[in-house]
Amino acid sequence: MRVAIGQAGGPTSVINESLASFVSTFSDDDIYLVLNGYEGLATNQMKAMGEMQRETIERSRGEPGAVLGSGRYDFSPALQKQALAYLMERRIEALVFIGGNGTMSALHAVQHLAEEAGYPLKVIGIPKTVDNDIAGIDHAPGFGSAAKYVAQSARYSKMDLQAMRNFEQVRILETMGRNVGWLAQASGYGMTEEAGPDAIYVPEREYSLETILGDVRRAWKEKGYCLLVISEGVTINNQQTALSNSRGRTILGGVSKVIEEAVREKLELVSRAEQLGMNQRCYYPAVSKVDQQEAAAVGTYAAKLVQNGESGFMVGVHRHDTMNYKAELTRVPLQIVSDGGERLLPDTYIEERKAYNEWLEGIIDLPPVSTQTQAGSSSIL
């Protein structure tokens, strides 16, 4: 059986776990490696896997990045047809990609083109994302580790800010997440409302600049400093902030700078904007063991789907209940994932940090902070 597999979109700390687990169930003769994501698929950048490539992939289990190469690519309908032609030329029987919701939509499109051409191509998706915006599942591998990094960063940043409040009064941490707030909301994990961020802003809500300045003013008057966390996709005064546009994709970012400048100009407080940056998706010391295990499991499950002749599905991660976390892997039709769009953070998790934290606890592999060590309780000031 000839199987082509690739990685697409932004990497995660555990994306290589899924790849290594998938290829470990096949012989070298079965696997064709697609290099550089959908660009490689559209330009015939495929190579048969040999022992050297297998060893490299196996070593990549403990590394971030995407060992096959990934990246962004405007995979247009014309390029999808071109990619299918290359797959047919190489007599590829199954196409598997590890990626997010855009990747799943692309897989669904290629499957449809193959059906129209009468070519029996099996198509399977393996989920990954730090944003947790894939429809039809509870969460995707990659999110748990990113959430852990955000939670730790916010926790320690607030302790640092508390110590420096006579020099710096306001700090704004900006997270990834695109148009959903799952990752930003993780900044309050394991802490009481009082000890966590003074406010968390997510894209599922719209905010005015005056509302945000009011939150800053209240926190500063109460304790002399304020820590805000904001997702990159948040809209302020009906405007979203973008850094640039690349390969047909808007690159969000910079909203923390908007707030920093407003705080400095209108409240005359010393403020600092900090983007948590790419470490959210690649800081391997913060990897969640649960996330790592689930990334490997979805790769193995996807291999079984291919070997059983299944097609048109993404591997789904679901849970039995929130309080006693246990993951269950299922098949989710690519049609549902594609049609579902971006999975938003529910109102309950926005309004009740405790409810969100209970949902996150089984995934993040990070103990809550004891009440004795919460930010604010360790100061004698």
From Swiss-Prot:
Needed cofactors: Mg(2+)
EC number, as in UniProt: 2.7.1.184
Coiled-coil ranges (or none): none
InterPro entries: ATP_PFK (IPR022953), PFKA (IPR050929), Phosphofructokinase_dom (IPR000023), PKF_sf (IPR035966)
Domain of life: Bacteria
One BP term from GO: fructose 6-phosphate metabolic process
Entry keyword annotation includes Metal-binding: yes
Gene3D superfamilies cross-referenced by the UniProt entry: 3.40.50.450, Phosphofructokinase domain (3.40.50.460)
Record: active site: D131
GO molecular function list: 6-phosphofructokinase activity; ATP binding; metal ion binding
List of residues binding Mg(2+): N101
Catalytic activity: 6-deoxy-6-sulfo-D-fructose + ATP = 6-deoxy-6-sulfo-D-fructose 1-phosphate + ADP + H(+)
Job description of the protein: Part of the sulfo-EMP2 pathway, a D-sulfoquinovose degradation pathway that produces sulfolactate (SL). Phosphorylates 6-deoxy-6-sulfo-D-fructose (SF) to 6-deoxy-6-sulfo-D-fructose 1-phosphate (SFP).
Protein name from the UniProt record: Sulfofructose kinase
Species assigned in the record: Alkalicoccus urumqiensis
